[in-house]
């Protein structure tokens, strides 16, 4: 998780096909 926090502008494609920002995902997980 710490590594992801260094790249807040990255996006991640979710299994359902949506793209979410890594920062948003880490916020949801946290």
Swiss-Prot record:
Its EC number is 7.1.2.2. It catalyses: ATP + H2O + 4 H(+)(in) = ADP + phosphate + 5 H(+)(out). Signal peptide: none annotated. One of its GO terms (molecular function) is ATP binding. GO terms for biological process: proton transmembrane transport. Keywords: ATP-binding, Hydrogen ion transport, Ion transport, Nucleotide-binding, Translocase, Transport. The keyword Cell inner membrane does not apply. It is an enzyme of class 7 (translocase). It comes from the Eukaryota. Belongs to the ATPase alpha/beta chains family. Catalytic subunit of the peripheral V1 complex of vacuolar ATPase. V-ATPase vacuolar ATPase is responsible for acidifying a variety of intracellular compartments in eukaryotic cells. V-ATPase is a heteromultimeric enzyme composed of a peripheral catalytic V1 complex (main components: subunits A, B, C, D, E, and F) attached to an integral membrane V0 proton pore complex (main component: the proteolipid protein). Two separate genes encode the catalytic 70 kDa V-ATPase subunit in psilotum and equisetum. This is V-type proton ATPase catalytic subunit A isoform 1. It comes from Equisetum arvense.
């Amino acid at each position: 998780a710490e590594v992801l926090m260094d790249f807040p502008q990255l996006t991640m494609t979710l299994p359902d096909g949506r793209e979410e920002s890594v920062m948003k995902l880490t916020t949801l997980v946290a």
